[in-house]
């Protein structure tokens, strides 16, 4: 065992006296800033004890680690969980929660580095998990329906827009120094399954709220099994057994065997980005988020990454969230892009990695 993910890490301690909650709905019950059972200071002593146990099983060459799943706000609070004698890392849900907006993304990236650097902890990045709407759907939702968790029916967003933004968001995330966490199926560009029949649902959230004045569809839509073979969609992968949640027909086109070897596929994009991330040493680099400088760059997210082999700001990560194409600077060359065929101009909803012209990067 290499380590442990601590579920609901912010919920181990209750307020003294176990006070009643006057009004409790599903919304307020999960609010980390106001409930007497979330993010209490006493939780940290528990993790200090656990850390000592983990360290007793660790060596310099083989560390046992602990990762916190803690939904806390504001972002400064998460740094308390990754102090040197507590967790090694914590999921960055502030990043996951951020809408598709350049200013908001610049702020959360800068703040993430600020709070984690203050406690000498690695910054982490995550876009999807088993509790939230898959980002290939979430990032294309209309503003009035934009949400992390699926409470009720939403309008099916444009899948092309959603996948384009998801690929751009992933390319941005995998260019950032720190640790990146991937959720199964995102490498295939899977959308949230929004139309699971009621009699096929499994999430207790659905059954607990069904028939109430605030019904919730729950998390089943992001938990549908991934499609390995296009010919075996609607089975558990053996061609015979029904999956525990039904797979939609669109999953056939997104199956692993359909995407493998297709250089334009989302699966091959993930593989190429992860390979280049390792080769460039981006995870171990340092980042700087420059000021936009002009109104023309207001819809651009730019991050300068310094690595051992590529010097000060040697790799520039640029995401274009605006309405117009963004010209690649004359002294830079595209070494990775969330869309195929990008060379001199970055399209809308696209992210590129740029090296200095003449750099030996393949």
Protein language model regions, located:
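Active-site and adjacent substrate-binding regions of carbohydrate-active enzymes
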Residues: 1-332, 337-362
